[in-house]
């Protein structure tokens, strides 16, 4: 009799409906709901849910910025985001001077003796050694890359050294294992910024001439992009991922006027028949809205993203964040003191944890990323769980995607 009564009081929701409900919830709630039950956690960490949630969040892009740099604390997310104009900023406690690379909402920060891979959305940090054994040569002589293998979905770190020693390696974040790479066809200068676009990492080399070196993360093969869009590529030219296309941002002068030009690359063909073409996406006059004192002041600009209306968000090397309104041809300064790291999209894919990995959770006990069991949901079938079910069902009915 008691068993019957208990069964009639229980609430069951099919996993497919639960997944649709979870898709509508804010990140903070999703992180808490992972602690309710193994079933909920498996749903929230499933590949299908992560992909569906990621597709929704592509339309809710934010900016990741460094905040209150602290050399003695591990990186941690600021509890609440802020707004500059109508743009949402997510702040990360970290040393902005440390080299960093981003891909799909994940962040790779290098420090002496370690690669730190962070997932700010899931509140996870993994640390990896810089090689399979003792690493030769100083870090300043490394050429680094970080990105996602489009075939396997795995994130990888690339490390190359062309000075003092010749070492070329790739780290699979999934396994934590370093493998050897064959040497690229061109010697590259250390410190060149890398960009990951559609499963390939790109580096811009500027010396006597210029070339873009591309590496396919799945095939571990190299390609050279020799035909660049213009002859005025300089040390200030920035290579970026803009709307899932490789893009170059450069400043040129037409008479007394300075112009920010952004060129985007298209790939034609495959394998040995692969070809590259460039098209000009933006040509923006910097006469109004951006202060200059050329030639004494070196200035370069990095695009962040393009809105649905075609407005461009970009920042410079003097901690200024700008927004260009294409409809009115107007530039507005959103912030004059911000250390932009990159664009930021939510990524719920958990970082793999192997016995060889060093593991940390971001934040502290007061952080929204605390991963201890949430005491709001102590047992399945409790009255609190039933209230929770009722609440999320109400949200499912009332809140649109």
Curated annotation (Swiss-Prot):
InterPro entries: F-box-assoc_dom_typ1 (IPR006527), F-box-assoc_interact_dom (IPR017451), F-box-like_dom_sf (IPR036047), F-box_dom (IPR001810), SCF_F-box_component (IPR050796). Signal peptide: none annotated. It comes from the Eukaryota. Residues 7-53 form the F-box domain. It holds the Pfam family F-box. SMART domains: FBOX. This is F-box protein At2g43440. It comes from Arabidopsis thaliana.
